[in-house]
Amino acid sequence: MERINKIVLVVDDNHDLRYMVSARLVSAGYRVYGAANGCEALEQLEEHSIDVVLTDYHMPEMNGFGLLSVCRVKWPSTPVVFFSGEQDDIAHEAVERGAFAWVRKGSDLTMILDCLDLAIQESAHA
């Protein structure tokens, strides 16, 4: 998949992790915006045409489920991928609530890229 001009919004309250993931996504060809919590993510979604959201679950102000709920209403064609170290029950609940997928923090970059690519491809055909 051609990643040039595809935009990922990385949402995580851990600045260092957000920066590291963003840098890797940029090196893979994506354009990336970042947010420290769900409220900041909503601002980014309002300002930019985001292709996919990669979000943590535990964050201050608005957690990943809160962000997912708003995204499903305001940007239903924008896939949300959870990127978290949480237990499997949180992962299953995220998918049940409408997340495209869940990727465990620490996963291989190729796995993350494959998931983001697939999310964008499927949303383009929806």
Predicted regions and their residues:
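Non-catalytic signal-transmission and effector/linker regions of two-component phosphorelay proteins
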Residues: 1-7, 110-126
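Short hydrophobic/Thr-rich beta-strand motif most characteristic of the beta2 strand and flanking loop
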Residues: 29-36, 44
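Active-site residues of response regulator receiver
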Residues: 56
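Receiver (REC) domain active-site loop signature in two-component systems and cognate sites
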Residues: 59
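Alpha4 helix (beta4-alpha4-beta5 surface) of REC/receiver domains from two-component response regulators
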Residues: 66, 86-114
